[in-house]
């Protein structure tokens, strides 16, 4: 298959996937921040087995108590994870008492866990996450630049990997902006952990292809660079797709049968793994070819490779 000759269409597909997310980020409320970023309280409530309480009942009770901003997640087995504004001890005890008396009177030890995140801590979390992502990107760039020092223009390998990384990150953030609007998904600490995991996975996929390109550059020094890239993609695509497909199946199973508390983490991984598998073939490698042909800004200037 002529992967290199179709790079313009790969760029168009990426643009079509990224654009809706950008629109939601700009025109809609954007990302839906959790209490890890805004500050607030979270609690886990567990009612008696005989109560048969559902998520709507808990949400309605919170609304009746003037906690309209609260969100509720069903953890199964009559357990619920509640996020709301910042509560002091008095407000927390009053809230739990009112919910218990209304939904499961007489139940004991309903409150299973309580966490408080102040706005200052939330702000520090945002900044720490930002610097962690920047540090990861710089580290990845330096490593790839050094690892590919034996091939011509090793700098472009590092920059191409960063382009793919940015591509995958934008896709994840954009889709999460849409999911936040449609499914009330929050951006929290688990989101950031998953995003850093996606960055590592994306780079791993890219390095597999780049390493094969490096090997073929040394073996087939008499062949044009686009031909070498095409050959390298053909030799690695089966491995990349099989690995990604296996991981995607596992993630789908966890989303369907796993707990709600790691829902955001799993969705980020699901989106990121798919984006990473695509970008290693359709973005990172094609940026290398476009750079080699000095046609990064001229995507229509394709070269068919057989």
Locations of the language-model features?
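A structural signal for conserved, well-ordered secondary-structure elements
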Residues: 1-306
């Amino acid at each position: 298959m002529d992967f290199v000759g179709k790079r313009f269409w790969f760029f168009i597909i990426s643009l079509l996937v990224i654009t809706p997310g950008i629109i939601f980020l700009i025109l809609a409320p954007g990302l839906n921040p959790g209490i890890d970023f805004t500050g607030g309280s979270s609690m886990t409530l567990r009612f008696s087995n005989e109560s048969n309480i559902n998520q709507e009942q808990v949400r309605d009770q919170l609304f009746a108590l003037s906690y309209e901003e609260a969100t509720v997640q069903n953890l199964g087995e009559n357990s619920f994870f509640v996020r709301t504004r910042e509560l002091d001890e008095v407000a927390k005890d009053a809230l739990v008492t009112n919910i218990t008396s209304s939904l499961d009177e007489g139940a004991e030890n309903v409150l299973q866990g309580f966490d408080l995140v102040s706005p200052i801590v939330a702000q520090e979390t945002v900044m720490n996450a930002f610097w962690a992502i920047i540090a990861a990107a710089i580290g990845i760039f330096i490593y790839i630049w050094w690892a590919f020092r034996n091939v011509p223009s090793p700098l472009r390998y590092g920059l191409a990997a960063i382009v793919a990384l940015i591509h995958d990150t934008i896709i994840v953030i954009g889709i999460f902006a849409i999911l936040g609007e449609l499914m009330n998904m929050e951006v929290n600490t688990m989101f950031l952990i998953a995003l850093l995991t996606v960055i590592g996975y994306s780079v791993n996929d890219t390095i597999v292809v780049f390493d094969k390109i490096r090997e073929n550059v040394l073996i087939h020094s008499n062949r044009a660079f686009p031909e070498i890239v095409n050959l390298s993609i053909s030799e690695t695509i089966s491995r990349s797709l099989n690995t990604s497909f296996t991981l995607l199946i596992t993630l789908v199973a966890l989303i369907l049968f796993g707990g709600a508390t790691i829902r955001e983490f799993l969705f980020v991984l699901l989106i990121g793994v798919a984006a990473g598998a695509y970008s290693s073939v359709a973005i990172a490698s094609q940026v290398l070819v476009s750079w080699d042909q000095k046609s990064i800004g001229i995507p229509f200037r394709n070269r068919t490779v057989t």
